């Protein structure tokens, strides 16, 4: 079951978190992902799949 989008959602540990303590710039997915370099930050984005590049942003980092 996918979570909703908005400021109340975030991705982490491969799961979706919706609540006052959650925050995500994009709609997250329950699927886990990781960047090839294993680094997190602006290079990682969690959607239906993992995308790594300058056009990706996500906070916090998706599951390593």
UniProtKB/Swiss-Prot annotation:
The keyword Metal-binding applies. GO terms for molecular function: metal ion binding. Cu(+) 3 binds at residues 11, 16, 18, 27. Cu(+) 5 binds at residues 33, 40, 44. Cu(+) 4 binds at residues 44, 50, 58. It comes from the Eukaryota. Keywords: Copper, Metal-binding, Metal-thiolate cluster. Cu(+) 6 binds at residues 40, 52, 56, 58. Cu(+) 1 binds at residues 3, 5, 18, 22. Cu(+) 2 binds at residues 5, 9, 24, 27. The keyword ATP-binding does not apply. 14 cysteine residues are arranged in C-X-C groups. These are thought to be the metal-binding sites in other metallothioneins. The metallothioneins are involved in the cellular sequestration of toxic metal ions and regulation of essential trace elements. This isoform binds exclusively copper. Belongs to the metallothionein superfamily. Type 2 family. This is Copper-specific metallothionein-2. It comes from Callinectes sapidus.
């Amino acid at each position: 079951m996918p979570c909703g989008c908005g400021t109340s959602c975030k991705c982490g540990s491969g799961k979706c978190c919706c609540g006052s303590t959650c925050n995500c710039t994009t709609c997250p997915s329950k699927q886990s992902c990781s960047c090839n370099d294993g680094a997190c930050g602006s290079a990682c984005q969690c959607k239906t799949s993992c995308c790594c590049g300058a056009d990706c942003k996500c906070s916090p980092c998706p599951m390593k």
